[in-house]
Amino acid sequence: MAIYGIGTDIVQLSRIAAVLERTGGRFAEKVLGPDELRVFHARRARSEARGIAFLATRFSAKEAFSKAIGLGMHWPMTWRALQTLNQRSGEPYVVASGELADWLAARGITARVTVSDERDYAVSFVVAETDAPPPAPAPVPRTLP
């Protein structure tokens, strides 16, 4: 496997809370996939702070993933096309759907994700890998003294 790209993102939890309040909850529905949305509602019902932290880590993971694959938030990378779920062990993993899944499969891209949150911030890091041979590196221009 070769590294296709890496991405990282950090978001302030208060920013996510403010957007969620301003949109009456629609922000979560816009950003989260169906499985993520179920977890968000369950966590938020138990603790508003844990719900906000979950939403922030998932938002951050999508941003980091979009950077790792080199597209930013442009088709086929859409908010709901990528979900970050958790194994029983707690390990996060990404699941792509629709046209994003097709785009990734055509390029042999898989990804690993890690997320974390603390009192004020959520952070994510994504490593996208491919089984395709990496392109030759661009020559480095030499400068004369």
Swiss-Prot record:
A single cellular component GO annotation: cytoplasm
A GO molecular function held by the record: holo-[acyl-carrier-protein] synthase activity
Residues that bind Mg(2+): D9, E63
Cofactor(s) this protein cannot do without: Mg(2+)
Catalytic activity: apo-[ACP] + CoA = holo-[ACP] + adenosine 3',5'-bisphosphate + H(+)
GO biological process, one term: fatty acid biosynthetic process
EC number(s) from the headed UniProt entry: 2.7.8.7
Keywords attached to this entry: Cytoplasm, Fatty acid biosynthesis, Fatty acid metabolism, Lipid biosynthesis, Lipid metabolism, Magnesium, Metal-binding, Transferase
Keyword Lipid biosynthesis: yes
Protein family: Belongs to the P-Pant transferase superfamily. AcpS family.
HAMAP family per the UniProt record, alphabetical: AcpS
Entry protein name: Holo-[acyl-carrier-protein] synthase
